[in-house]
């Protein structure tokens, strides 16, 4: 019964992927819109994202929700730009609720894509090296990996979601850890995003980049030292 369910899930997801690719290449309007969305995230300017979302008027919140799910699937597009935009557009706590719920939906989609379609698809949507790094975290911290990674801003939330789907972890354990883990970052980004204007925007963005790079260097050094330690123990 379980195998039949997984097979059905694979068929449904494959049909959805094929349909999405076909629409992208065959419908000019969709192609143009998707290219615009990619360029918007690539700009690194949350005001561009905010203006795009705001242009949909009464449907702005719905568009933001869908964009968050899209950026989750198309890792590693920067989610913090959308979180900043939501806070700046809707108010910091309203934006936080929207960003948190939509990020949870996106994480769930990534989890099930990996769980149903497997590692090859997950690697194509993220990166082989990125998943390998998260695998290292899972080997070391087990189920606590989700909570730890969600609290580290320099680790892609989306890659963690895909990696979790490749493990034996239950969806509910993943969902709860994800919800708790990404709440602090969502609140902080939303609060800051609600105040960002002009020079403050550039200043905070620079601080975030500096912090992320510093933390990344520290973590890579830690992983390198652990591997060297294992090699030395293996020689003894």
PLM regions and their residue ranges:
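Extracellular/periplasmic helix-loop-helix junctions in multi-pass membrane proteins
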Residues: 186-204
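Membrane-interfacial helix-loop-helix
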Residues: 2-10, 20-64, 93, 104-159, ...
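Hydrophobic alpha-helical transmembrane segments that constitute the membrane-spanning cores
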Residues: 102, 114-115, 184, 189
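Transmembrane helix boundary and interhelical junction motifs in multipass membrane proteins
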Residues: 65-94, 154-160, 172, 179-188
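Transmembrane helix-bundle signature of multi-pass membrane transporters/permeases
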Residues: 100-104, 151, 175-183
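Hydrophobic core positions of alpha-helical segments in small-molecule transporters
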Residues: 63, 98, 176-177, 189, ...
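Transmembrane alpha-helix boundary and packing residues in multipass membrane permease domains
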Residues: 83-84, 111, 120, 162, ...
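Transmembrane alpha-helical core residues of multi-pass small-molecule transporters
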Residues: 67, 102, 106, 180-181, ...
């Amino acid at each position: 019964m379980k195998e039949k369910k997984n097979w059905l899930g694979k068929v449904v997801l494959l049909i959805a992927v094929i349909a999405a690719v076909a629409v992208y290449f065959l419908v000019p309007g969709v192609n143009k819109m998707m290219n615009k969305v990619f360029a918007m995230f690539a700009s690194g300017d949350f005001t561009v994202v905010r203006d795009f979302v705001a242009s949909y008027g009464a449907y702005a919140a719905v568009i933001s929700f869908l964009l968050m799910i899209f950026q989750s699937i198309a890792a590693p597009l920067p989610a913090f730009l959308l979180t900043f935009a939501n806070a700046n557009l809707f108010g910091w706590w309203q934006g936080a609720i929207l960003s948190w719920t939509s990020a949870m939906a996106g994480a769930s989609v990534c989890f099930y894509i990996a769980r149903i379609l497997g590692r090859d698809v997950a690697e194509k949507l993220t990166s082989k090296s990125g998943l390998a790094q998260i695998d290292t975290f899972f080997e070391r911290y087990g189920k606590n990996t989700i909570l730890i990674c969600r609290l580290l801003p320099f680790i892609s939330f989306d890659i963690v979601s895909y990696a979790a789907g490749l493990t034996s972890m239950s969806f509910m354990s993943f969902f709860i850890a994800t919800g708790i883990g990404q709440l602090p970052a969502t609140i902080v980004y939303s609060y800051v995003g609600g105040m960002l204007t002009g020079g403050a925007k550039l200043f905070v963005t620079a601080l975030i980049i500096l912090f992320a790079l510093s933390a990344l260097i520290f973590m890579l050094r830690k992983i390198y030292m652990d591997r060297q330690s294992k090699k030395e123990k293996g020689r003894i």
